[in-house]
From Swiss-Prot:
Annotated protein name in UniProt: Short-chain dehydrogenase/reductase ARMGADRAFT_1018437
Known EC number: 1.1.1.-
Pfam family, one: adh_short
Use in biotech settings: Melleolide sesquiterpene aryl esters are cytotoxic secondary products with anti-cancer potential. Armillaridin shows therapeutic and radiosensitizing effects on human esophageal cancer cells. Armillaridin induces autophagy-associated cell death in human chronic myelogenous leukemia as well as of hepatocellular carcinoma cells. Armillaridin can also inhibit the differentiation and activation of human macrophages and thus might have potential to be developed as a biological response modifier for inflammatory diseases.
Organism: Armillaria gallica (Bulbous honey fungus)
Amino acid sequence: MGNAWSLISQMFPPKPKWSVNDIPDLTGKVVIVTGGNTGCGKETVKALLAHGAKVYLAARSEEKAKEAITKLKEETGAEAIFLSLDLADLVSVRRGAEEFLSKEKQLHILFNNAGVMLAPMDMLTKQGYDLQFGTNVIGHFHFTQLLLPALLAAATPTEKARVITTSSSANYMGTLDFNVWKDSPARSKKASGDLYVQSKHGNVVFAVELARRYGEQNIISHSLNPGSIRTDLQRHLSPFANKMQDVFLFPADMGALTQLWAGTSPEAGKLNGEFMIPWARLGKARKETGDPAVGKKLWEWLELQCKDY
């Protein structure tokens, strides 16, 4: 009952008590937003630019990213920097991280925002993983790991570095099955929705474990449900499903609110390993996401998948 109630109640959150106007001055802060060319990511970049941050917009499509950068400059007067990143290819992930590290010594905030939802089952990552789990969890894990030197360089006891990972209310709907994330007979028995749920559950497990491992080194790691948001994530849904779902969806600027709160507010900076819910509130993820044994198992599995890349 608790998981079901959490899922349903977060579809209809109360009016926010925090807004982008409450974001502190971010002058001198270096930030990366994955999937920053569209939806919640783009709105996140917009708010960060408006408050003085130096923002790297990480995306797969250079054309779409540069269109977004041009539009955002018109709206804010500030220009984001394109960072080439395909989370579905671990080689591209390393290349993107190395490009960033060649330009910056410090990274103050990393928004692991990009995601794939309900992709067709025949879609796999470059290395043969389920596209959803590979993009949402494995790609972001590898990217975060490679950027740890810059995060640690930016982190101090009074100004901690932050890693904010976007999950969803889907984290309440299931747990992890380590046997279905690579193309296999076991995976073929699963539905796309189940694999999406696992990826969102995995986002929270990863975020909690990151806090557990690096909290003492002044890195804050939170995950969140951005809310029921109208974005490109729904591109794999049928027209009928899109139309039905549209009734319950909020605009992308609302979807950026909770991750901006997690990533910039003094309140969220006093916490670690938490799960945030719409709009800009502290919540609770599914209980299993906080299990240290599960966190350790997932972390070690992810390290094994990424070690050759």
